[in-house]
Amino acid sequence: MGVAAPHAAAAALGTELSWGGNIAITSNYIYRGVSESDGRAALQADLHANTPGGTFAGAWASTRERSLEPGAGYDFEIYLGHRFDLSSAWNATLSARSHYFPGATEGTSDDFQELSAALTWLDRWTVSVSAIPNAVRYWYYTRLSRSPAWIADTTGQWLIGEGLFLTGGAGYYRSSGTGAGRLAATGYGYGNAGVAFERRGWRVDVGYFLAATQAQELFPYPLANHRVAGTVSWHF
């Protein structure tokens, strides 16, 4: 009896979990104002599990341009979080994620961890604040050090027709810095606007992306300024 109880608990947990995810292909892997695919297409996938109480965990992966730092052909990320329903319209989310560059050819790791808090209205508008305690700091294509970074951003989508949305987002990335000159604290803004169409689990996004030139001072990736990108995804 003492052995059977843990198995029963595990089985009960398994029946309570709900699973989901998506598979996507994008013409340009743009994230926070820079392109990690060097303007080329990327394949991406996500798989996650949710509990009835609001806890979720999952994994996400994307191909990327191997010639860019740190010499990895793809990104891999695991995450854990909890969603709090504040009312019928509002919810808050706390989450943590760990980002990896498997198979990187450079000798020094660019892996990092991130903590985030988000507030969402009707799953249509979200504002979030994130902290990266060990963010890697670059000066163009030269790796300098690690220093804490903060990110504030907002995203939204507005229904304008059956399955048709206007989309948009804006954010600001701030590196705390570790000294003077090229090591000084700095930051940059980024944003996007576009349209999206959803039907039967499929979604098509087309967006126009902007980013301040200061992004090139912090990341060894091409700037995604005045760029158009499209993504096709299937959600299950």
Please report, for each region that a protein language model flagged, where it lies by residue:
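Outer-membrane beta-barrel "beta-signal"
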Residues: 158, 193-202, 208, 222-236
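Short glycine/proline- and aromatic-enriched beta-strand/turn motifs that initiate or cap beta-hairpins
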Residues: 10-67, 130
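Residues that define the transmembrane beta-barrel architecture of outer-membrane proteins
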Residues: 15-17, 39-43, 72-76, 90, ...
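Repeated loop/turn-to-beta-strand initiation elements of outer-membrane beta-barrel proteins
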Residues: 53-59, 88-94, 123-129, 158, ...
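Outer-membrane beta-barrel architecture
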Residues: 46-48, 79-81, 95, 116-118, ...
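Transmembrane beta-strands of outer-membrane beta-barrel pores
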Residues: 25-31, 61-65, 84, 98-102, ...
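Outer-membrane beta-barrel translocator domains and adjoining extracellular loop/strand segments
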Residues: 31-38, 67-74, 104-111, 137-145, ...
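Detector for outer-membrane/organellar transmembrane beta-barrel domains
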Residues: 108-179, 208
